Amino acid sequence: VADCVVEIWQADAGGIYNSPAEHRGKADPNFIGWGRFPADESGRLSFETIKPGAVPGPKGTMMAPHLTLWIVARGINVGLMTRMYFSDEEAANAKDGILSKARMTGRDKTLIGKREGDTVNFDIYLQGENETVFLDV
């Protein structure tokens, strides 16, 4: 989407969020944990960050390392929320609750960023056969 803005939230490398609600420890003071990025005219954007650690999920489970993304743009009445998981975290991804639910419908691949060297590529599709899984939060 050419005129979209994507906001990204994530834990630090140790799986700790830089948030007043975080009670598991002190987050890396050199890492903010979020950013907001506009897409260019072709709908592409890029940013530099660290790979987050796994974070606790419901009922004592662990969520695989991921970025949470919120997409807003003209024509989208409510921001869309999704996640990007990492292709090199196969064991953690196999245990993640959201990925497990998406796997039941064969749509888990829409949530996996593909590592290529030091870069992870992730395409977000708003509709169609490859539509990204969006979370109802």
Protein language model features and the residues they cover:
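Beta-strand-dominated extracellular/periplasmic modules and repeats
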Residues: 1-137
